[in-house]
UniProtKB/Swiss-Prot annotation:
It comes from the Bacteria. GO terms for biological process: tetrahydrofolate interconversion. The keyword RNA-binding does not apply. Its EC number is 6.3.4.3. This is Formate--tetrahydrofolate ligase. The lineage of its organism: Bacteria, Pseudomonadati, Thermodesulfobacteriota, Desulfobacteria, Desulfobacterales. It comes from Desulfatibacillum aliphaticivorans.
Length: 587
């Protein structure tokens, strides 16, 4: 039975649902897991993925369902809520269903956006643990990452203080000769802290470190988080960590975590991080939570490991891609599925009347400010014009050979006439379409949606990648820009073109993934341009190299790995009851 999502806050719904939440022992029985495959951690548990996958290696995989979205408003269009709602709807239909979602960062949770647990009757529980650190994965990543910085800055200090003979005699280390102006790594913290974007470290005497400019980034922007999302096992994780480039020496050669002899210790911090955490929906469908990388510089997905486990345990496995189909889905399609070898059956395109109205020329949507009446009152013209963005995204999904299902994530202000326009446009573009009221009604409100996905899963598809790995970097970027974003072409800055040419000539980078860096608020590089922009070219100003994750990131704009905290952050409304320890105010 659904809770009253209009009157109850998300944290209140979670608290009520938690009263009947299965224990780790009950989950082991429900999922058919053996005792040594569950690693209990309080009310939650991690699972030993290697043992499960090895035991079930001969079991056929379930149906693989990805959830993406049209280009969103700054408010987001409810992909996580839709993912959870689909699990609940499939559960209501009696299906063996589960999923895998990303772990949220403490930064957005305490800032304007809030947590990523879903919402209303379609959320993950227990919400407090989910929102406030879960089973410690992000903390482990922070310790591992910052240990790398400690190793590098200490090494720079010792190399400054000792000559080559002293360095060898006292420490047994060779001189790395790191260039302080070419340090790639920074420190990380799991908050939005704009005051830490640019800092100076090492002030004091010769034993107080190496004086230089440095920086902090948000924890989920760490290359370690990206590695966690794509690693296949602990050996792969350790190898990738040792290959991370932390800086360049004064001759221009990369300096890695392996060179600093710190990579293995960093991997030791993440020995448990590699195992997914088991949670559930408010209606008690199981869901793994694992990894949480940015979708702008990284893959923007939960982990390959969680998907591999879920596909063995569930007949229907639901996962979510960050941002919209042009970014998150494109990386799911051409990176995650290529790395994993898994082939999806269905992609759900989350659509809202609100976002379609914005793309149709509606007033500007600003996070933290009241919506214009155009978004809460019927306006068929705006919806019809805005459907162009949805139709474009359907085309992107179909280009991958995956069966698309449009989910109208229906709000109470949406009208039947508005939804009818969306359905007509979606079906004309070759997609199934279903309305869903999962936020309000949980699984019961997602039955039409679940049925559409079940039907789509039974249809054959012709999944294939957009480009072969043999294709050169600049050709890949041009193909993504023209066939996914709708650009007329690509303009490379001279420095970026030179770097791309160097990377294309070095066979070491041939199998690196192409990880585009672009705004999520537009199909173009300009967040102001809505709908489906015409007559534009994609500018590439730089190419970032993530040698551990094996990503090459062409940048179509500036990025900051440290968001800022807004003027009305969520932490102002979060509290804890001293008598019970229960947390209130999360959303």
């Amino acid at each position: 039975m659904a809770y009253n999502a209009v009157e109850m806050a998300d944290w209140q719904i979670s608290e009520a649902a938690e009263e009947n939440m299965p224990t780790p022992e009950q989950w082991a029985e429900k999922l058919g897991l053996q005792s040594d495959e569950m690693l209990p951690m309080g009310r939650l548990a991690k699972v030993d993925f290697l043992k499960i996958i090895d035991r079930l290696k001969d079991r056929p995989d379930g149906k693989y369902i990805e959830v993406t979205a049209i280009t969103p408003t700054p408010l987001g269009e409810g992909k996580s809520t839709t993912s959870v709602g689909l699990m609940e709807g499939l559960g209501m239909r009696g299906k063996n269903v589960g999923g895998a979602l990303r772990q949220p960062s403490g930064g957005p949770t305490m800032n304007v956006k809030g947590t990523a647990a879903g919402g209303g009757n379609s959320l993950l529980i227990p919400m407090t643990e989910f929102s406030l650190g879960l089973t410690g994965d992000i903390n482990d990543i922070m310790n591992a990452h910052n240990l790398g910085m400690v190793a590098m800055t200490a090494r720079m200090q010792h190399e400054r203080n000792y000559n080559d003979e002293q360095l060898q005699r006292l420490t047994g280390m060779r001189r790395l000769d790191i260039d302080p102006t070419r340090v790639e790594f920074g420190w990380i913290i799991d908050f939005c802290a704009q005051a830490l974007r640019n800092i100076v470290i090492g002030l004091g005497g010769r034993f107080d470190g190496y004086t230089m400019q440095s920086k902090f980034g948000i924890a989920v922007g760490s290359e370690l988080m990206a590695i966690l999302a794509v690693a296949t096992d602990l050996a792969d994780l350790k190898e990738r960590i040792n290959n991370i480039t932390v800086a360049f020496d004064k001759s221009g050669k990369p300096v890695t975590c392996g060179d600093l002899e710190v990579g293995n210790a960093m991997a030791a911090f993440m020995r448990n991080t590699i195992n997914p955490t088991l949670m559930c929906t408010a209606e008690y469908q199981p869901c793994f939570v694992h990894a949480g990388p940015f979708a702008n510089i990284a893959v923007g997905q939960s982990s390959i490991i969680a998907d591999r486990v879920g596909l063995k345990l569930f007949d229907y496995h639901v996962t979510e891609s960050g941002f919209a189909a042009d970014i998150g889905f494109e990386k799911f399609w051409n990176v995650k599925c290529r790395f994993s070898g898994l082939k999806p059956h269905v992609s759900v395109l989350t659509s809202t009347i609100r976002a379609l109205k914005m793309h149709g020329g509606g007033p500007k949507v600003v996070a933290g400010k009241a919506l214009d009446d155009a978004y809460t009152k019927e306006n068929l013209e705006l919806v019809e014009k805005g459907c162009e963005n949805m139709v474009h995204m359907i085309g992107v999904i179909r280009k991958a050979g995956i069966n698309p299902v449009v989910c109208i994530n229906r709000f109470y202000t949406d009208t039947d006439a508005e939804c009818a326009i969306v359905r007509k446009a979606a079906e004309a573009a070759g997609a199934r379409c279903a309305e869903s009221k999962h936020w309000e009604k949980g699984g019961e409100g997602a039955l039409e949606f679940a049925d559409a996905v079940i039907e789509a899963c039974e249809e054959g598809n012709d999944f294939d990648f957009l480009y072969p790995l043999e294709m050169k970097l600049r050709d890949r970027v041009n193909k993504i820009a023209t066939e996914v974003y709708g650009a007329d072409g690509v303009d490379w800055a001279p420095e970026a073109a030179a770097k791309a040419e160097m990377l294309e000539s070095d066979p070491k980078y041939a199998d690196f993934a192409t990880m585009m860096v672009k705004t999520h608020l537009s199909l173009s590089h300009d967040p102001v341009k809505k709908g489906v922009p015409k007559g534009w070219r994609l500018p590439i100003r730089d190419v970032l190299i993530y040698s551990g994750a094996k990503f090459l990131c062409p940048c179509a704009g500036t990025i900051s790995l440290m968001p800022g905290t807004g003027s009305n952050p969520a932490f102002r409304r979060i509290d804890v009851d001293p008598a019970t320890g229960k947390v209130s105010g999360l959303f």
